[in-house]
Amino acid sequence: MTLTISDLPRDLKKKIFSRIPLRYVRALRLTCKEWETLIKSRSLKIDEEESQMVALMDYNLCLMSKSFNGGDPSTEIKGKLTCFDEQVKVSMLFHCEGLLLCILKDDNTKVVVWNPYLGQRRFIQVRFSHIPGGWDQFSYALGYYKNNNMMKSFKLLRFFDYFYTSNDFVFYEIYDFDSGLWKTLDVTPYWRIRFFDDIGVSLKGNTYWCAKERKPEWNADPFIIVDHIICFDFTSERFGPLVPLPFRAMKESLVTLSCVREEKLAALFCRDVVVEVWITTTIEFDKVSWSKFLTFGVRDCPMIYSCTGSFFIDEVNKVAVIFGQPLKRDKVFIIGEAGQVRDVDLGEPAHQDSWLYVCPYVPSLVKIKQPPGCKRRRQSSSENRRYKRNMMRLVELEKYHIAMEPKRGDKTI
């Protein structure tokens, strides 16, 4: 009697499937219903010993793995992810439920949402761009709500926020994958999200950022960077209240957020020569509670302050994996509970203005809804009026900034 894979115990089949490269698993799904069920199961997609990450390195996307076998953490670059032509570069990355939102470096007319596992992608045309100095001034977030059929319907949030005393200007808009339309949101921010921390973290369909209370300059504490987090709810399309971080981050300190197994948030706080990692015990739209997870000294690793906004933790072995760019090199710092530090050199990027950003990645069967066909809806007249008003204000703002720039030949004292 010939033994086939179908005759093997279910647990053994799970182990076999978990070691098959993603590019082959898609074909296996079509073989039989049992195999498709196994592939869809969470136990197959999440491996506690070895998990996957997507890294933005040198304007390219790479698949990485992090392993905690035997409590000895390690990272490895598996290879380059290709969604576009080799010449297309990615400047910003956002992850949500296995989907990657890619902001293109040299094309400010569109963004791309990509599912590497299914090989699906969708190009989304943006209504306008704002790139003074050559840098995209927008913040982005990808999230979803559950429709009447309990299916995930995705949306894209896009905004920028100037909070200068005399020239406050905000523009928040959201794109609905179902309708294929943009909508201007009526937002009056009572918060400030740091520009260099604006990638945010996706958790259960919503997005969280580090933030602080919005105050006029004369009434604000100039030394506080952030002391709260804020959530955008994609169901209600609104921001929640500021909820406190377990610390107040002052200047010369580092704060960044991460997601823990798609269930909790973690906050990394570096001050002086001490690093603290906190994990949420409760996390909701309008409330949060924290528990300290790790505290360790980094006297032997002052370069930890070059962290570029990416870190992961292993709750079982109490290890933090932090990504940084000291001395213009991409590096991984692996820090244990006792404060021991090991660093892995990933090399020098070819583009010195690029930055290293890493996000967790779990293969997903979520399909990207494609644009409506011939029955595409049109923007409402009221939305068109709101959009035109904002465009007029933006033009005036850009003129103001051009006028304020030093003239060529002016001496700077």
UniProtKB/Swiss-Prot annotation:
SUPFAM superfamilies: F-box domain, Galactose oxidase, central domain. Residues 2-53 form the F-box domain. It holds the Pfam family F-box. Kelch repeats lie at residues 156-202, 331-379. Keywords: Kelch repeat, Repeat. PROSITE patterns: FBOX. It comes from the Eukaryota. PANTHER family: BNACNNG10540D PROTEIN, F-BOX PROTEIN CPR30-LIKE. This is Putative F-box/kelch-repeat protein At3g22870. It comes from Arabidopsis thaliana (Mouse-ear cress). The lineage of its organism: Eukaryota, Viridiplantae, Streptophyta, Embryophyta, Tracheophyta.
